[in-house]
Amino acid sequence: MKRYFVLAVVALGLVFTACDEEENLNSSVWIGSESESNVIAQLDTLYLDARIENLSGAMRYLWTVDGKKVSTASTYKFSQPKTGEYVIGLAVSDDKGENLQTTMTAKVEGRFGKGAFILNEGNMGNETGTLTFVDSKGIAVDSAYYRVNQTLLGNVCQDLFISDNKMYILSQNGAKNGGEGLLTIANATSLEKEKVYDNTTLSWPSNLAVVGENLYIRDNNGVYMLDTSTEVLTFVEGTKGALKNRMAVVGDKAFVMGNKQLFVIQNGAVIHTVSFESALSGVAKTYDGNLWVSCTKPASIIKVSPVDYKTIDSHTLNVSIGAGWGVAPAFSAKDDIIYFSNAGFKLYRHVFSQNETEEVADIKEYVEDAGIYYNSLGVDPVSGEVYFA
């Protein structure tokens, strides 16, 4: 345990007695920590207390954080939503007028580096979107973005993309019902806001992908490219009919679903179109840098090269693999295992290396009042846990 001492020097008389020795012991105060640590994660609590030697009588306490008064109790619960180092001060005085002071430095680290994010669009009429975080221990932090920044995400949040430790959150209606804007950019580890964009050109934007400083945003007209360095928004010609669904990024290319085709976008232009025999229901990057593509009729999972756009392998499924009315792919994958539900409550997985499909679970057996498959399912790429919305 670290101790932070301040010694008070007491003047000694020329004549020493037993009583004088007791009264002239050095007094000290330090800040104690219940956890014996001065490091916490955002929104966690550091339990501190004043520890005193050789002071008696009525005590008065004053706690400060970076010079601002925060408490007059003998204990203090330190918690902060923002990362960084904070100087915690403690001043103690007794009824004889003796004053002691000490300080310590507490470090607040990013909380959101390991876990899963759940984006909730919220009620369009009177709410905004919210972001929930579930850490690796299963502890959920609701409205995590608001707790950190004290501002609200945009109205009807639609999609989230993480790239280079930045999080991009897209909303459909932007600054409505108190929302801060159409697109929010935040640090992915701390959720601390970096920038907010609003734009009246876009018509109900639904999905985004990030390649370097360029953002590809799909709306009712097609796909636009937003250069974040200049804030210039440009329509990508040839993307009319882009589906309301997530895009995939491999290298410097973005892959966008059309009805029976996949648009390949590079440097703000469509450089290729990959055609398929049936309607697409999902696209995602594979564990080995290729693409998973799901088709509806016949139900199938196809592995596609992002370099020459040829089919590496294709498996026909014995159950349907539709995306429903949501804005997310029909499937989610970890390694070569693809999970899907056909927008229903029965969860399936297809092991691509073995070309085998099996039913994993009936969600209604776990959630009795489940009424609707709302938008998507996702698989934690580390733990393999499946999140079902």
Short names for language-model regions:
Residues Y61-Q80:
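Surface-exposed, flexible coil segments in extracellular/virion-facing regions
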Residues Q150-I162, T201-G212, G241-G251, E277-G289, ...:
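Repeated scaffold domains used in trafficking and secretory/extracellular systems
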Residues G115-L119, K166-I169, N214-I217, K253-V256, ...:
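Conserved beta-propeller blade signature
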Residues M1-I40, A50, K96-A116:
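Bacterial Sec-dependent N-terminal signal peptides
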Residues G89-L90:
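Hydrophobic/tyrosine-rich beta-strand signature of extracellular beta-sandwich/beta-rich modules
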Residues I139-L152, E192-N199, T230-G238, G268-S275, ...:
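A short beta-strand motif characteristic of beta-propeller blades
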Residues N54-L62:
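Solvent-exposed loop segments of extracellular immunoglobulin-like
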Residues G122-N126, N173-G178, G222-Y224, Q261, ...:
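Short glycine/acidic-enriched loop and turn motifs that connect beta-strands
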